[in-house]
Amino acid sequence: MNKKIIVPIILIALTSCSNENFISSSSSSSSFVSSSSSVYSISSEINDEYKIVLDEIAGEVNIHQPIQDEFLESPDIDLKSLGINGSKELSLPEAINLSWKSTLPKDKNFDYFLVRIDENNNFTSPLEYKVPIEENNIDIYNLKVGTKYYWNVEAMSNEESITSEIETFITFFNYPRNIFVEGVTNFRDVGGWIIDENTRVRQGLAYRCGRLNTSSSSTLNIEITDNGINTMRNYLNIKSEIDLRLIENNEVGSYEESALGSGINYYQCPMSYDGNILVNNKNMVKNIFDLLSDKTNYPLIYHCNIGTDRTGLITYLLNGLLGVNQEDLFIDYEFSNFGLINGTRSKESIKKTYVKTIDETEGETLSEKISNYLQEIGITSNQIETIKEIFIEKY
């Protein structure tokens, strides 16, 4: 693991150790196996009498909880009227339930069902989940928004297997893509947002979230669970962690290397949280965008304490640079109120600080204003183009 403290003229490298285990499913006995890059040959049924039939998924599948949809459909609604005040964990996505019916030979001992999900019908990079043979469904979290998925189920034994036909479903194109990582609040993909009628921000590259350990603790207390670590490493494939918390007052909570284990780049980019956090952290914002322009750092996470203010600033600058409209940037900022953030946040508060600073910067569009501001603090035009190449995709 590489640890890098990013302060002007300081770069330190350290190493660490690893930890792994599971994502989430409909029961504690179902488990995420891997995000595999193998090519699978799909076995045929033993005969026509024995089969697995997948239940049809009608319409597009929504990843948001109903209370989240209420806000997304009417973003100017008073969140307190929905009971949203940052005191409860409401940031998790809605599970997608996949189910099937099976007729298996009684004289064969099948060990488990293997559920495969992929974005292509060749299953070249499937997500795999083991389900006990006595069960016939699983809850899936963290799929991309606006994406067509292929899936099948295979009953596995040491001797033979029975495989279903391949079916499909589509996730509803409704951002943000919020993520379930056990032990971490306020977790979502930076990607998925619409730029224009032809382009959007690519999903699966950068994630914003809350802390992974207890802040301001004199002893290290890791809050992300083993399940959460496994989700980060083996499902989201995280390579780098950017920590925006302060070091001088131990806001980092004695955290000196990534809790995600060995091989993860850990960058400390301490930012103050008082006043206009853009103006007061110019050098650190420059260093963070240096990291964002390095393709080798992806996929990555960045976070402060609760993943809202300093994390929200970086997200505003990044997605605004890419061309996401300002109203969507405000929606993403206020979506943090669903997390366990011990308070509420309003777009009105940031309009008076860093949003105002950017609005007063030269440029015709928000993207141009942010680009010009970043260049004023030392980011090059080539770095900006690299960031756009990394994140912008056609759809």
Task: State each model region's role.
Residues 13-16:
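C-terminal motif of bacterial Sec signal peptides marking the signal peptidase cleavage site
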